[in-house]
Amino acid sequence: DLVFYCPKCTAERQTACPKL
């Protein structure tokens, strides 16, 4: 899956953000 962890998301709820 083309998904990466954004610093902002990992800092808030540790969720994967969709790769733009």
Swiss-Prot record:
Alphabetic keyword roster: Glycoprotein, Growth factor binding, Growth regulation, Secreted
Q: What induces it?
A: Up-regulated by growth hormone treatment and down-regulated by fasting.
* Residues in IGFBP N-terminal domain copies: 2-20
Q: Write out the GO cellular component annotations.
A: extracellular region
Q: Name one GO molecular function term.
A: insulin-like growth factor binding
Q: Which domain of life is it from?
A: Eukaryota
Task: Provide the primary localization.
Answer: secreted
Reproduce the UniProt comment on modification after translation: N-glycosylated.
Where in or outside the cell it occurs: the entry states:
Secreted
User: Would the keyword Transmembrane helix be found if you checked this record's keyword annotation?
Assistant: no
What is the purpose of this protein? Answer: Inhibits IGF-mediated growth and developmental rates. IGF-binding proteins prolong the half-life of the IGFs and have been shown to either inhibit or stimulate the growth promoting effects of the IGFs on cell culture. They alter the interaction of IGFs with their cell surface receptors.
Print the domain comment field.
The C-terminus is required for IGF-binding and growth inhibition.
| Quaternary structure and interacting proteins, as annotated | Binds IGF2 more than IGF1.
What name does UniProt use for this protein?
Answer: Insulin-like growth factor-binding protein 2
| Upper classification of the organism | Eukaryota, Metazoa, Chordata, Craniata, Vertebrata
Gene designation per UniProt: igfbp2
